């Protein structure tokens, strides 16, 4: 244990940093959990979530597809799956956490969760010093952002 951070949390941060170093190999795609993106995989994932993807035009779809092809595609919980070695969705992760707390009280390696006021769901990993790592939207990969102001509703330890 480093200070009051459990060893598994230290390991989660180390794994997240490793993934971040290789972030160009990853692409965000809603519903993806670590598949290698081929045309078939892309179309299957796109077809599985018509209500989510209807916001994109045909031209935007083509741009997103070109960005994803050949990469490993993940969404936010897919990123956490790679970090933890578990397989869950964002809500299941936060519901399985101990030490549920407010985002300002999370510790390094804890999860952060939001529903964006009921408009969706998102999960990320507190990596310390006021930052978190996540995979959050199309045409992007694994990224690091500031915790404050993101709209996190709660956090917890897995």
Q: What is each of the regions a protein language model found here?
A:
Residues 1-77, 81-86, 117, 133-135:
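N-terminal capping segments
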């Amino acid at each position: 244990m480093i200070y009051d951070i459990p060893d598994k949390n230290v390991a989660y941060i180390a794994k997240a940093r490793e993934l971040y170093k290789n972030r160009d190999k990853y692409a965000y795609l809603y519903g993806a959990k670590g598949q290698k993106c081929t045309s078939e995989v892309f179309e299957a994932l796109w077809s599985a979530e018509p209500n989510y993807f209807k916001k994109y035009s045909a031209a935007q779809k083509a741009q997103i597809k070109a960005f994803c092809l050949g990469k490993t595609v993940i969404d936010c919980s897919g990123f956490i799956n790679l970090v933890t070695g578990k397989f869950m969705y964002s809500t299941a992760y936060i519901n399985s956490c101990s030490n549920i707390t407010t985002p300002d009280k999370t510790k390094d390696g804890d999860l952060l969760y939001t529903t964006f006021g009921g408009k969706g769901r998102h999960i990320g990993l507190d990596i310390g010093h006021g930052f978190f790592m996540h995979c959050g939207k199309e045409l992007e990969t694994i990224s690091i952002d500031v915790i404050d102001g993101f709209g996190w509703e709660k956090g917890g330890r897995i």
